[in-house]
């Protein structure tokens, strides 16, 4: 608990002095005022996040956290639970969607086992993935708490520790996840923290039909009624209806914010983790970059609660960190506008009136 408390205490808002300096330069770039729109907004944020007019973003790390969920027993996913471990191996071997798009972004992918149901020790022993394993999957949240409060703290602190471990190797973090049925706890978290109903926060996940979606909503409603999570206590929400990988991602976000490093939030599950981070440390939102708007129904509700506009809208619903990977090149573009584009004075170009 001490690491969580000290990390939260270290999270400060963006550097307003550097933001003012960056704004002054961006206002004078050789184009009609703010003609590159939200890319300039992003450049401004990067300066404020890092406290630098030369924000570093070259060393990129996507942390894909894996975990299983007891609520999968309720039939809320189109895929069996063993797919979690199979896809972890696929990512580790470079064959997954995130593996491919990370190569495009010149980013490294680090998979972390937070609590998969299967044995991933061979991948851990070979150095292909890291283990911060808490248990072989959460308990079924439809029947009781998904985890203990102590396990919730452990998951958060594992994510913080990952951020600290890679602080010297990464300028820019991205979030990713792998866990069959993890849209179900994510919908529960969004319903609680974005002040929505279970129906409003629940989509079709891996591609279930409408009848199964209605069943999924009923399972989430049962979990909320059974556990009565306190929406004003992010730790209670995580313990009662969360997941180990979701807690790990929330901790990663807190850790990045404490380090003043930008972190790109991937899709629906990652955004649920971001809501938990916001609940625990509101200033952590200052370091989040929303990668994309997925087609998962509750994602827009979560983004609105964070006050974030996503960079991309490509009808994604995969997770893994795929949207975060694609957004990394936009982040680089924003940084380069701040550091490489000439001002009117530098280029001897006349300004408009």
From Swiss-Prot:
Single GO biological process annotation from the record: cobalamin biosynthetic process
The residues annotated as the active site are 320 (proton acceptor)
Q: Which Gene3D superfamilies match?
A: 1.10.1610.10, 3.40.50.10210
Q: What is its EC number?
A: 2.4.2.21
**Annotated SUPFAM superfamilies:** Nicotinate mononucleotide:5,6-dimethylbenzimidazole phosphoribosyltransferase (CobT)
> Which cysteines bridge via disulfide bonds?
none
The family database entries (CDD domains) matched by this protein are listed as: DMB-PRT_CobT
Q: Which pathway does this polypeptide act in?
A: Nucleoside biosynthesis; alpha-ribazole biosynthesis; alpha-ribazole from 5,6-dimethylbenzimidazole: step 1/2
Which reaction is catalysed here? Answer: 5,6-dimethylbenzimidazole + nicotinate beta-D-ribonucleotide = alpha-ribazole 5'-phosphate + nicotinate + H(+)
Can the keyword Glycosyltransferase be found in this entry's annotation?
yes
Task: Tell whether Transferase is among the UniProt keywords.
Answer: yes
Q: Which UniProt keywords apply?
A: Cobalamin biosynthesis, Glycosyltransferase, Transferase
Q: What does this protein do?
A: Catalyzes the synthesis of alpha-ribazole-5'-phosphate from nicotinate mononucleotide (NAMN) and 5,6-dimethylbenzimidazole (DMB).
Family as reported in the entry's similarity comment: Belongs to the CobT family.
Protein's UniProt name: Nicotinate-nucleotide--dimethylbenzimidazole phosphoribosyltransferase
